[in-house]
């Protein structure tokens, strides 16, 4: 890779690393795994940086690499996932309620299959169109729509199965303690 392309890649990483880390954290539940996922994707992308003709598409390319890498990891392990109470850090300006909602969403996303989680993340968090999501995941637009429909139905079921009244009582208790 030419020196100019190395500098261009370094600048790209410097300016986009926060957004890319957020994308990685939406793909895997553990913050450390998200950092590993992003690092692996950056290493793989670095080797092919000169092959990306339109650098405006670098984010989409990197997301695709992250999704593929996450899928490789998922296939490699024998589903020995151990539930954990550790949740991703929230940004400083998040209110307590927003933090709790984000934590709940991150936890609920764990019930989805990797393909479903990828579709939900790209469509709803990354704000990609159906066609963009289909291209990024290598599937048809119809498959994206049906996968999203099933994933959202599964998320609704999971939300309904949880005791949301208990969560509301906990929130009221926290507010009383804070007052």
From Swiss-Prot:
Coiled coil: none
Compartments where found: Cytoplasm
Keyword vocabulary terms for this entry: Cytoplasm, DNA-binding, Sigma factor, Transcription, Transcription regulation
Keyword Transcription regulation: yes
Chief location bin: cytoplasm
InterPro entries to which the protein is assigned, alphabetical: RNA_pol_sigma-70-like, RNA_pol_sigma-70_dom, RNA_pol_sigma-E_actinobac, RNA_pol_sigma70_ECF_CS, RNA_pol_sigma70_r2, RNA_pol_sigma70_r4_t2, RNA_pol_sigma_r2, RNA_pol_sigma_r3/r4-like
Molecular-function annotations in GO: DNA binding; sigma factor activity
Superkingdom of the organism of origin: Bacteria
Cell division listed as a keyword: no
Example GO BP: response to stress
Motif Polymerase core binding per record, residues: 36-49
Cellular component GO terms, alphabetical: cytoplasm
DNA-binding region: 130-149
Pfam families: Sigma70_r2, Sigma70_r4_2
Function noted in UniProt: Sigma factors are initiation factors that promote the attachment of RNA polymerase to specific initiation sites and are then released. This sigma factor is required for normal cell wall integrity; it is recruited by RNA polymerase to transcribe genes with cell wall-related functions.
Similarity-based family: Belongs to the sigma-70 factor family. ECF subfamily.
Name this polypeptide is given: RNA polymerase sigma-E factor
Native organism taxonomy: Bacteria, Bacillati, Actinomycetota, Actinomycetes, Kitasatosporales
Name of the encoding gene: sigE
